[in-house]
Structures are given as structure tokens and as C-alpha cells.
């Protein structure tokens, strides 16, 4: 018997937004009676950009900016039609990227 798995990946620059969104998704799935695995924290991606403060010279004067991308992974095992409909109705905060994939296990 093959089971289906719905894999949800959440990405955002603010870790609190990712955690609150994951909590909303897990509460909704548990209300509908499906099994949940997660949230699994994935490695944080850190991007650093270095620029010169001055326009022409003074190479020793630099400034660094960084951007961190936080990720969480949630697996829903054997999702029902009711579960997928309720997930589509959830209000998510702006700034959270959601990627949903279905897999056969």
C-alpha cells in the first residue's frame, strides 16, 4: 500500500514568521485528523555583501550587510481532501514563501 506525503517548505527572512506559520499549519492539519511530521528546522542560509563606504578611494573603509533565510520542513502523511482544502484557506503573513509538493512513499 503506497502512502502519499505532502511536503511543505517554508522560507522567510524572519525566523518568528516561519515558526508562527508552521504552528498554524500544524494546528490546521491536526484538527483535520492527518498525521504531521515536523517542523524540521533546515540550515539557515546566510548571504553577506561587502561594499565600499567611499566612492573612489579609502578601500579600508568597508561596510557589510547580511541577509539570513530561515527554512522549515513539514511532512503531512496521507493528507485527505479536507486537509488540503483547509490548508488553502489559511491566512499566512506576508514575507513567507510556501512550497508544496506531493510524493508517493
UniProtKB/Swiss-Prot annotation:
SMART domains: Ribosomal_S10 (SM01403). GO terms for biological process: translation. One of its GO terms (cellular component) is ribonucleoprotein complex. GO terms for molecular function: structural constituent of ribosome; tRNA binding. InterPro entries: Ribosomal_uS10, Ribosomal_uS10_CS, Ribosomal_uS10_dom, Ribosomal_uS10_dom_sf. The keyword Ribosomal protein applies. Pfam families: Ribosomal_S10. Keywords: Ribonucleoprotein, Ribosomal protein. Part of the 30S ribosomal subunit. Involved in the binding of tRNA to the ribosomes. Belongs to the universal ribosomal protein uS10 family. HAMAP family: Ribosomal_uS10. This is Small ribosomal subunit protein uS10. It comes from Agathobacter rectalis (strain ATCC 33656 / DSM 3377 / JCM 17463 / KCTC 5835 / VPI 0990) (Eubacterium rectale). The gene is rpsJ.
